[in-house]
Amino acid sequence: MTSYSFTEKKRIRKDFGKHRSILKVPFLLAIQVDSYRAFLQGDVESSQRKDIGLHGALKSVFPIVSYSGNAALEYVGYKLGEPMFDERECRQRGMSYGAPLRVTVRLVIYDRESSTKAVKYIKEQEVYLGEIPLMTENGTFIVNGTERVIVSQLHRSPGVFFDHDRGKTHSSGKLLYSARIIPCRGSWLDFEFDPKDALFTRIDRRRKLPVSILLRALGYSNEEILGEFFEINTFHINPDEGVQLELVPERLRGEILSFNLTDGGSVIVEAGKRITARHVKQLEASGISALAVPDEYLIGRILSHDVIDATTGELLASANSEVNEDRIIAFRKAGIESVGTLWVNDLDRGAYLSNTLRIDPTRTQLEAQVEIYRMMRPGEPPTKEAAQNLFHNLFFTFDRYDLSMVGRMKFNRRVGRKEVAGEPVLYDKKYFSDRNDEESRRLVSKLGETSDILDVIKGLCEIRNGRGVVDDIDHLGNRRVRSVGEMAENVFRVGLVRVERAVKERLSMAESEGLTPQELINAKPVAAAIKEFFGSSQLSQFMDQNNPLSEVTHKRRLSALGPGGLTRERAGFEVRDVHLSHYGCLCTIETPEGPNIGLINSLAVFARTNQYGFLETPYRKVVEGRVTDEVEYLSAIEENQYVIAQANTLTDDNGQLTESFVPCRFQGESLLKPPSYVHYMDVSPMQTVSVAAALVPFLEHDDANRALMGANMQRQAVPTLRAQKPLVGTGIERTVARDSGVTVNARRGGVIDQVDAGRIVVKVNESEIIGATDAGVDIYGLIKYTRSNQNTCINQRPLVNVGDIVASGDVLADGPSTDIGELALGQNMLIAFMPWNGYNFEDSILLSERVVEEDRYTTIHIEELTCIARDTKLGSEEISADIPNVSEQALNRLDESGVVYIGAEVRAGDILVGKVTPKGESQLTPEEKLLRAIFGEKASDVKDSSLRVPPGMDGTVIDVQVFTRDGIEKDKRAHQIEEYEIKRVKKDFDDQFRILEGAIYARLRSQIVGKVVNSGVDIKKGEVITDPYLDGLKKSDWFALRMKDEVAVEAIDRAQKQIQAYQKEFDQRFSDKRSKITQGDDLAPGVLKMVKVFLAVKRCIQCGDKMAGRHGNKGVISNVVPVEDMPFMEDGTPVDIVLNPLGVPSRMNIGQILEVHLGWAAKGLGHRIQRMLEANAAIADLRKFLNEIYNHDKSLVGERVDLSQFSDDELLNMAKNLTDGVPMASPVFDGASEQEIKRMLDLAELPAGGQTQLYDGHTGEPFDRKTTVGYMHYLKLNHLVDDKMHARSTGPYSLVTQQPLGGKAQFGGQRFGEMEVWALEAYGAAYTLQEMLTVKSDDVQGRNQMYKNIVDGDHQMVAGMPESFNVLVKEIRSLAINIELEDN
């Protein structure tokens, strides 16, 4: 039995799951948090750090040695400082949340004169290397005041890949095979066949060269190349005639001989017959070692080595040349006894390398390297050193080439080597053994006889010969995840490499001029690289903060786009499609609709990345048909070797598989296998889906396309005023809410000491207090009415009362879209599926007015409006209440500084911040000059540029922030805000100190009461300390007490030290905060002052708003109908929403119907509990009824709620929380069955069929037949008509065409396009059409005149020449065709 936490006891969700969960859902943000923690290694001792992340990047670039070699800069260690501002301050001030990185480096200068490398002097120093962004505990970064998420990238793993062109290159449709070595950084190396079966190579996708040039550049001769790639047939040449072949029977298979093949007189194969496998076996059995063949058999064969006349030294035939009659005669003449030829055939031993050597123009290693230099650097004259250096740097030095640990592992596995570790560069035995430097000797001694490039070419030839298979690049074994930490490390390394170049130049100066490390290193390149990555990389995205689910999903997203990834336009169908290997790793449902479909994926619930970055998913081990509780993670490559059963496979109590044939997966196929064959079993039915899809109840009854929409639309739900838990959920709502970080969870257990709307104080349990300095008090500040990235409202509400006992992890406060710690995205609405006067045509939704009245879908949106005062050429702008030509009424909401009051209710067009801008001097009329002379300068040299409420917006001012540049005097409002902020901080610190002090005194009291005194204030020696005595004593006098008991004396001293330490710490923290608040702000160049005004906008639901269920059943509200007109049930309850029944069958999302039935049952059970409470039923009866709800069926794992754990008060409290409906969980792919839903309906005393008689609200008549009615969790999506509705009379125009701009953001007009023109033409509305195309659009004079005419009350219109026609004329003139307009 599970024990229930304080939060869970408030409300338990009835679970219909039939399969016990072995593995808890892992921490959902682990992919982000763990990756960045490994990158920083901030809490790891310097000596213990692994070679990854910052440490790895610094170690790979240092030491930096000067060009002369007499000075070196070595890396010692690094430490991260404390961030200057905390997260809240960074959000407020628009700053980035990060910590300074300080690296300790050592400058070593060697003595030039000494013959050995003697150290002249060493200088060690700490160098500042810029700010490193810190991750918040919820996996986000704060960059320039906004929360951003670095999305993980799914890219092709480094390593070697074999592929073919699918017959698309050549017209014959012949498959051209290719191989590609992809490093983590460095040049790509490709090998490819051409249609004539010669093998070519490309470096970095440049022009192709015969592969033999690359091999020759490595130092191989023709003979060595042929020896590596071919098996040799040896022929002994008889002095007279005929040839003896050293027989390897297997090599004759498939050949047709022109002579009889005999064994001691008996013919094995007749002339002209093909040699088959049977003949080969006979030959092997006969034991013939040599075979006499005629000279013709040798003609046309290819020599494997040079044939040289031993006496004269003359070259008779070179390697790779064909044998002909003349050559055989020459061989006999020269007394050549034996020659070797290549064993090739057209079937499975292609002469590919031999063909390639024929087209290779180079002869020596240097020629080959020069040829590669010419290809890489066309136009540059090659020298010997340049060619050798370029070739070496391409693949053989770590500075320029890095396969990475992953790449080496994939490479070695693919070419069939045992060990997975190795060098990050490409290794070749011949090339490195010919070089004579220390590094090469080290590599040769370590790696010996292997050769990477040869192995790849051999592998490619094998595949071309029909042995071996090409790789599937869409398999997850060939795609890996690059998370935040790795990307940040790469960027950091790039910055360091830039620094390295500059340091190398300066190091030579350091020798002579005695520079320090700080003077050598300039941190700018590193800081710039990091800032660019976090601020503007394609994968650094503005966080989707609509609701907790959208945050979690955004952090768990995997994108195939981004630097080094795919592009939308070039990605084909295969990359986007669901692949067999996605099972349990990537969600098969959740992906965006539109151009990114399939390129952006979501991590499955249980998936994680392994040390190499490949996705892996957990499985339960099965031993001899018995399922164990041992869990193993397998990657996509590993799971290929095993037979894996589904999670819903039937087992008995001992875990033995009961079915005689179990449905399994093996190598991507679905099979039925006996239990003994099964190796593993899925851990959970929801293993294949992502968090968003796992939140859709009855997902198994929905069509995949609709499920996709349902998963995506949950992310767009706007948090409502009062969150309401879904009646029908899936059981992971609590996990999602907890991991998203929007709720406040107790860090340690204890008793609630204080609660108010903004703060919760917990007195920690004695057992959980760590160390002597820990006062055992946890203070949680709550977020109040803060704006999210999507302008929705983030607000936390406490759930606990003073005196409540909480344990670690309990939910103390709800955030947006959470209800008692469970995710609650929408509201439970009473729904009827029926047509209603055409108002639910085409997915429209009919809504009851009651929903609006009860504010069920009212949402609060917080808009941030900014007013900036800049320094202009004509003088500085000023924020003030003194604005020209504005009525008193317009200024009545502003204070004397010109800033709106908090709490003011404002509407579109109202002034929020008064601002005046200097105007350019214009020519003055004599009258103006006179007035100026009399009344002084000021009046007309400024214009009004105040911040006003944008059109279509109204709300209440809830916060104002004033930022003033350093050195500029703050106005009165800024001082007020400052004082308020300081007071708030002071109160916080005072309260904290008071609570801590109280806790220390309370603990001390328990330790000294009852002890005998030696000395003290107002007490005699030998008396016993009592509670009343301590109550009458001043707190400071407690410390004067001295007892006989040494332990008590120690406790008093310890308490005094603790209080003094806290006092000192709090004073220091307060002065730090105070100086932060009062210091000037760091504003953009040219900005003197910035005022931010926050408006809270209340949005009620209305026609045109978009709503949706969780099954992809979306629609737009068509009408809001009075309650009395809505269809109602027998007991008079009107329905809230009427949906179109025709929206269900064609969409095949039947899940919504099951949800409605079960939701109705849940609500009905809640009503029954309410009736019991109202009737003051006995607790025993209540317990019995709850037992009947939760524990009726023993097959359900989620059942067996142990109600005996609940005290009577706890049970009553839970029952009160259940009156609104008993929440149910129907887990994904393991949900409630039809019988269970019917049973619940019976228990709730509702019709088991789920349908009831409805009556027409207009007439009161019953409808013809019964209707499906029930409760569905319905969401309001962030597509609000208020945000889209927009009207324009006059506004901005485009400069070139003089037509109005488009779109709400530009305050644009509505386009009257080609088809609309046709419509007016069809009506014959000529004047309307003329007006549309001229004065209402781009006839400049006409529209100005029209405006004047309307003002004068003269309603005439004169249409002139549209500007777009002038543009057309100009465009035609640019083609040198002159068009002139003649007056008629």
UniProtKB/Swiss-Prot annotation:
Reaction catalyzed: RNA(n) + a ribonucleoside 5'-triphosphate = RNA(n+1) + diphosphate
Its GO biological process terms? DNA-templated transcription
A cellular component term from Gene Ontology for this protein is:
DNA-directed RNA polymerase complex
Task: Fetch the InterPro entries from UniProt.
Answer: DNA-dir_RNA_pol_bsu_ext_1_sf, DNA-dir_RNA_pol_bsu_external_1, DNA-dir_RNA_pol_su2, DNA-dir_RNAP_su2_dom, DNA-dir_RNAP_su2_hyb_sf, RNA_pol_bsu_bac, RNA_pol_bsu_CS, RNA_pol_bsu_protrusion
Its keywords, alphabetically, are: DNA-directed RNA polymerase, Nucleotidyltransferase, Transcription, Transferase
Name the residues that span the membrane. Answer: none
Q: Which family does it belong to?
A: Belongs to the RNA polymerase beta chain family.
How does the record describe its quaternary structure?
Answer: The RNAP catalytic core consists of 2 alpha, 1 beta, 1 beta' and 1 omega subunit. When a sigma factor is associated with the core the holoenzyme is formed, which can initiate transcription.
Which NCBIfam families does the record match to this protein? PRK00405.1, rpoB
Would you tell me the protein name for this molecule?
DNA-directed RNA polymerase subunit beta
Per the UniProt record, the source organism is: Xylella fastidiosa (strain M23)
